[in-house]
């Protein structure tokens, strides 16, 4: 298994390009199953999860063409197997996203129950209940969700008990080809949901209210092809900005957007960062100062994102003062804390709150990544620590960050990959 070797205590300095958002690319790739003409998706990040989704479509008989710029052209009409098999789904929860589109376009779907990161309970029952409300017959047996519909799905009024991003996306996609009008209430408002809706609209869907908690979809008879570029990754953007703040550096990130990152930029401002922005770039400059500790509470968008929580815990470990970080979205999401403690961090856990008392510096140590964002926090900790840090199990990082060591090297970090 690959590891990352990081030499610390050097401010990050320089400029990097931000990749396309994985959490936008995955549902959009699934949405190509709805079209009866080729769809071309650009700005896809080079990530394992994207490769898995492309492999999943290919395994189902869908014809795909990929160019050197990671643009993918998808011909869904060539589909031969309406099954998403366990061996692919188990490595990536987002495979559940093919359920709605397959059912809506082809009248049946069989999808293995998902795998992915080990963060708390993420039930798929809201997806199932929503599709049943639209007239689907669904059976869960032998570890598979087996769904069928006679004719077309029917528009329905669906209230989501809890805000779920993939649940909203699955039902949004299914509703585009349903008979009549579907209303999704308590819908997720994330930028990635908006991006998916914009792509569906480019394919001919009739959608209103995306970005609010009530989405209205008027079903259409068919969706056509389009070309669409995935939006920039706000979590990757935030991760590099926090790394710059923690190391007292100065970093400019390009090909990104400030409007999808407001809650994070607010907290970095509170930490003492000088932030400037342009049409497609954000620059953060600490002017050599130590960051100030910040307190925050995670919640669904537009509040502070749970996917940035671990990175702020890492920054707080070397900040001036004490910060309380409350996690309200996922249980079991402080697995990075015990690893940070091995590096000398002073962190007290009280239920779903991490109280972080900043120390002058951390000490490099061997640590282990437990999930995608926790691993990013360990990289940040390694960058600020004295001595060398060895991060094990970095396949978690590779699921969400494109070429993290190469981008960090461009910013002057001492970091290299050690092949397993």
Curated annotation (Swiss-Prot):
UniProtKB keywords: Cell cycle, Cell division, Cell shape, Cell wall biogenesis/degradation, Cytoplasm, Peptidoglycan synthesis, Pyruvate, Transferase
Q: Which residues form the active site?
A: 117
- EC top class, in one word? transferase
Please name the source species. Answer: Hahella chejuensis (strain KCTC 2396)
The reaction(s) catalysed by this protein are: phosphoenolpyruvate + UDP-N-acetyl-alpha-D-glucosamine = UDP-N-acetyl-3-O-(1-carboxyvinyl)-alpha-D-glucosamine + phosphate
Tell me the route in metabolism or biology where this protein functions.
Cell wall biogenesis; peptidoglycan biosynthesis
Location in or out of the cell: Cytoplasm
Keyword Ribonucleoprotein (UniProt): no
Q: Which domain of life is it from?
A: Bacteria
Membership in a protein family? Belongs to the EPSP synthase family. MurA subfamily.
Function of the protein: Cell wall formation. Adds enolpyruvyl to UDP-N-acetylglucosamine.
User: By its UniProt entry, which HAMAP family does this protein fall under?
Assistant: MurA
Q: What Gene Ontology cellular-component terms does the record carry?
A: cytoplasm
Report the Pfam families cross-referenced here. EPSP_synthase
- Annotated UDP-N-acetyl-alpha-D-glucosamine binding sites: 93, 122-126, 307, 329
Q: 2-(S-cysteinyl)pyruvic acid O-phosphothioketal occurs at which residues? A: 117
Q: Name one GO biological process term.
A: cell wall organization
Q: Where does phosphoenolpyruvate bind?
A: 22-23
Q: What is this protein called?
A: UDP-N-acetylglucosamine 1-carboxyvinyltransferase
């Amino acid at each position: 298994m690959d590891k990352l070797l990081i030499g610390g205590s050097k401010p990050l300095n320089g400029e990097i390009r931000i990749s396309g958002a994985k959490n936008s690319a995955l549902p959009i790739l699934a949405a190509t199953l709805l079209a009866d003409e080729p769809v071309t998706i650009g700005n896809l990040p080079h990530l394992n999860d994207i490769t898995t989704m492309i492999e999943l479509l290919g395994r189902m008989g869908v014809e795909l063409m990929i160019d050197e710029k990671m643009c993918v052209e998808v011909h869904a009409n060539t589909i031969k197997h309406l099954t998403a098999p366990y061996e692919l789904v188990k490595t990536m929860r987002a495979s559940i996203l093919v359920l709605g589109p397959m059912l809506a376009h082809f009248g049946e779907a069989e999808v293995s129950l998902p795998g992915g990161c080990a963060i708390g309970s993420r039930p798929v029952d809201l997806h199932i209940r929503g599709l049943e409300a639209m007239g689907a017959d669904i059976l869960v047996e032998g570890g598979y969700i087996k769904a069928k519909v006679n004719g077309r799905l029917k528009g329905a009024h669906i209230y989501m008990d809890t805000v779920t991003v993939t649940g909203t996306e699955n039902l949004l996609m299914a509703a585009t080809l349903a008979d009549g009008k579907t209303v999704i209430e308590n819908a997720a408002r994330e930028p990635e949901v908006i991006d998916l809706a914009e792509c569906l609209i480019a394919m001919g869907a009739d959608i209103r209210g995306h970005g609010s908690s009530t989405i209205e979809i008027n079903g259409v008879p068919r969706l056509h092809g389009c070309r669409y570029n995935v939006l920039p990754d706000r979590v990757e953007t935030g991760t590099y900005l926090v790394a710059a703040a923690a190391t007292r550096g100065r970093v400019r990130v390009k090909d990104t957007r400030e409007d999808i990152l407001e809650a994070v930029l607010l907290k970095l401002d509170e930490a003492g960062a000088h932030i400037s922005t342009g049409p497609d770039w954000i620059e953060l400059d600490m002017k050599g100062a130590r960051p100030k500790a910040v307190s925050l509470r995670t919640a669904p968008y537009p509040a502070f994102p749970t996917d940035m929580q671990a990175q702020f815990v890492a920054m707080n470990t070397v900040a001036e003062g004490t910060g309380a970080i409350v996690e309200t979205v996922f249980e079991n999401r402080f697995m990075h804390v015990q690893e940070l403690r091995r590096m000398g961090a002073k962190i007290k856990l009280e239920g779903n709150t991490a109280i972080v008392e900043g120390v002058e510096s951390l000490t490099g140590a061997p640590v282990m990544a437990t999930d995608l964002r926790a691993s990013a926090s360990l990289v940040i900790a390694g960058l600020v620590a004295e001595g060398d840090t060895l991060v094990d199990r970095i396949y978690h990082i590779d699921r969400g960050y494109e070429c993290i060591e190469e981008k960090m090297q461009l910013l002057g970090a001492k970091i290299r990959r050690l092949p397993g």
